[in-house]
């Protein structure tokens, strides 16, 4: 007997996840994107990473046929942008500082990390698709605290001792400032 979907959603909501924008271009060169909390490193040799996308997403046809995609890992102050990219009808690229990389990807300027991939493989996975990418380029910012999503909301990245990472990477008290 399969697990209850509601209970599974509740259980998975308890798993903290980073938040990223995943972007690709359609055949006409128009950028498309979605918000993902399913960005995962798979292998270092060869360098592989994956994202998952619902088959019902408006951008599904683009990602089901693209040859490349990029992942912009969001900072904690990018939550409005994360919500915009999670909606079906939003003009996702209006506002926000998007730039083109040397490889041609559209990425968020100021993301804590950017990972550019060529599609290595696509795997059907129930009502989703797993997009496995071979990492071609990585850029990491030295400053910035990553966005975290847990219990169906954005949360601060803090230790049990009450220290939150600062933009310099050192812990600061959760109630400071």
UniProtKB/Swiss-Prot annotation:
Gene3D superfamilies cross-referenced by the UniProt entry: Electron Transport, Fmn-binding Protein, Chain A
Keyword Oxidoreductase among record annotations: yes
Pfam family, one: Flavin_Reduct
Pathway in which the depicted protein is active: Antibiotic biosynthesis; actinorhodin biosynthesis
One record GO biological process: pyrimidine nucleobase catabolic process
InterPro entries noted in UniProt: Flavin_Rdtase-like_dom, NADH-dep_flavin_reductase, Split_barrel_FMN-bd
Keywords of this entry: Antibiotic biosynthesis, Oxidoreductase
SMART domains xref list: Flavin_Reduct (SM00903)
EC main group: oxidoreductase
Stretches that traverse the bilayer: none
Enzyme Commission number, as recorded: 1.-.-.-
A molecular function (GO) term: FMN binding
Family as reported in the entry's similarity comment: To S.pristinaespiralis SnaC.
Record-given protein name: Actinorhodin polyketide dimerase
Native source species: Streptomyces coelicolor (strain ATCC BAA-471 / A3(2) / M145)
The gene coding this protein: actVB
């Amino acid at each position: 007997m399969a697990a209850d979907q509601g209970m599974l959603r509740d259980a998975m909501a308890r798993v903290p996840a980073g938040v990223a924008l995943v972007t690709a271009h359609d055949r006409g060169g128009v950028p498309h994107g979605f918000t993902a909390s399913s960005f995962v490193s798979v292998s270092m040799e060869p360098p592989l990473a994956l994202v998952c996308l619902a088959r019902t997403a408006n951008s599904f046809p683009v990602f089901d046929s693209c040859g490349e995609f990029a992942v912009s890992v969001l900072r904690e102050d990018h939550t409005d942008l994360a919500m915009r990219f999670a909606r079906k009808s939003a003009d996702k690229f209006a506002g926000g500082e998007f730039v083109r990389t040397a490889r041609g990807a559209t990425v968020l300027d100021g993301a804590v990390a950017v990972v550019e991939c060529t599609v290595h493989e696509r795997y059907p996975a129930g009502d989703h698709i797993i997009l496995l990418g071979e990492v071609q380029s990585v850029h990491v910012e030295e400053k910035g605290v990553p966005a975290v999503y847990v219990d169906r909301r954005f949360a601060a990245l803090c230790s049990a001792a009450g220290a939150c990472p600062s933009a310099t990477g050192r812990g600061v008290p959760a109630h400071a400032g």
